[in-house]
């Protein structure tokens, strides 16, 4: 009988460990997928009875009345409007600033200072959202009131700046919440953009410099084109963060007695803040299911946004 050599035994053990590790990794990956599916199924199952009992159009109605099982009439029109408008406002404000910071940190600042400034930007992500909300209400809103009045008086013919459904005096508008959200998503967009710009091939930068390009021309011809898809992915990740923000928006936005009209000076609720505001009343199944239906809409919206971000970042880095 031929005995296996130590090398053969070692090879068998290695292959067995590889199979075990592969199985463990596959199980871990499957757990994530299963968790997402289970959450979606839970939301859908709890939402369906309320959707069947709903007396309003779920997608087009601005009414959200859950006072009783027999009087359910709820829709997500206003929730969708406030959520999307405040998030898009945040994105429009945050992305240019984030790109500027990322270019500054990777192309203009020495490595030691770049690490210091990067840590300070990343530290912004550690600030609790309730602090941002309080800052928005007590500090930012009063400062923004003259700007809001100016925009409303001079650009009121444009739907974004016409009079909303809440008073400009209080500052509890989408305009204020959008700016606060812009500050909150700034670290995410900056961090991803910074890492993308940092991996710009040195040969491309040196080639541009050899042609006599200035620092800005180097950035314009090499760094920005290379990081185009990375910045787009960073923006989508920031958008996903803004869509799901709850506490800061709940503190800032004023409730409105009438429907919004796609103005930055509207008030109301986002999906997340509406659910959070009624969390203490989740006792009856059908009214609770109405909020769960809104949560499912938010879940689907954020899932799509993050899937798009993943698809963009999975493509060529230089677009």
Curated annotation (Swiss-Prot):
Protein's UniProt keywords contain Transmembrane helix: yes
CDD domains to which the protein is assigned, alphabetical: TM_PBP2 (cd06261)
Main location: membrane
GO molecular function, one term: phosphate transmembrane transporter activity
Record PANTHER family: PHOSPHATE TRANSPORT SYSTEM PERMEASE PROTEIN PST (PTHR30425), PHOSPHATE TRANSPORT SYSTEM PERMEASE PROTEIN PSTC (PTHR30425:SF1)
Similarity remark: Belongs to the binding-protein-dependent transport system permease family. CysTW subfamily.
Name of the protein: Phosphate transport system permease protein PstC
């Amino acid at each position: 009988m031929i005995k296996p050599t130590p090398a053969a035994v070692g090879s068998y053990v290695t292959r067995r460990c590889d199979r075990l590790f592969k199985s463990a990794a596959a199980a871990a990956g499957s757990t994530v997928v299963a968790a997402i599916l289970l959450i979606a199924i839970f939301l859908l199952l709890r939402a369906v009875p309320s959707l069947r009992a709903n007396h309003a159009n779920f997608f087009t109605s601005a009414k959200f009345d859950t006072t009783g099982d027999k009087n359910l009439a709820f829709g997500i029109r206003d929730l969708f409007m406030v959520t999307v408008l405040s998030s898009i406002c945040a994105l429009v404000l945050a992305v240019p600033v984030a790109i500027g910071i990322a270019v500054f940190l990777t192309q203009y600042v020495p490595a030691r200072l770049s690490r210091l400034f990067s840590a300070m930007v990343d530290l912004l992500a550690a600030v609790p959202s309730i602090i941002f909300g309080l800052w928005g209400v007590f500090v930012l809103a009063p400062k923004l009131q003259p700007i809001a009045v100016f925009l409303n008086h001079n650009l009121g013919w444009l739907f974004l700046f016409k009079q909303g459904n809440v008073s400009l005096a209080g500052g509890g508008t989408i305009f204020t919440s959008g700016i606060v959200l812009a500050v909150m998503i700034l670290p995410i967009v900056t961090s991803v953009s910074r890492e993308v710009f940092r991996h710009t091939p040195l040969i491309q930068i040196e080639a541009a410099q050899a042609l006599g390009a200035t620092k800005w021309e180097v950035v314009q011809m090499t760094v920005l084109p290379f990081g185009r898809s990375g910045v787009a992915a960073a923006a989508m990740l920031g958008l996903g963060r803004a869509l799901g923000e709850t506490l800061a928006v709940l503190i800032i936005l004023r409730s409105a007695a009438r429907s919004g009209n796609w103005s930055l000076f509207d008030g109301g609720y986002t999906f997340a803040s509406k659910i959070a505001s009624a969390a203490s009343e989740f006792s009856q199944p059908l009214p609770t299911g109405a909020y769960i239906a809104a949560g499912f809409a938010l879940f689907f919206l954020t899932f799509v946004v993050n899937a798009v971000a993943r698809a963009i970042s999975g493509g060529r880095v230089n677009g």
